[in-house]
């Protein structure tokens, strides 16, 4: 999704704090990306500050790492991203109850990111939604920091299978997508009152703004 834009967007930079392999950043991609890819080493705090500097200079940086490692960057998320409002995109891998050990548990990502003022938090429920969100967050129309909770294999495998939830009798929605979900389901409601909203998503946004 990002690679085709490198030729025309010199400020589009992918950053990894020494976790490229576990975040889908292959060796082949890194070689093709050239200066559009930077590995900061095991220095997540520096990676966030570095990304904020790129964004402040007009670039569109994308920082990818595991949810558990973002915990080390809380100070930089507050001081570098929140206070400056820089349009950095954070790709949050392994969020929620994931991983097979305590070290790589991403259970605290929403609690942490949700307490960073001005940080837009998105959780796509499909691969397509993820790519759409990534395209928006790295575009010039976005002017603030964004974190995207990258969907895992369970979601992606279900999407590939085409097994969508249906035959719903009730619609449950929560958060700022409330009205949008309700309106969409209302328009699709059948004569017997059945409605389905299969691709609902969680997000937190700044008061008074819409995405």
Residue ranges and their predicted role:
Residues 75, 152, 163, 204-210:
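Sequence-pattern detector for short linear motifs
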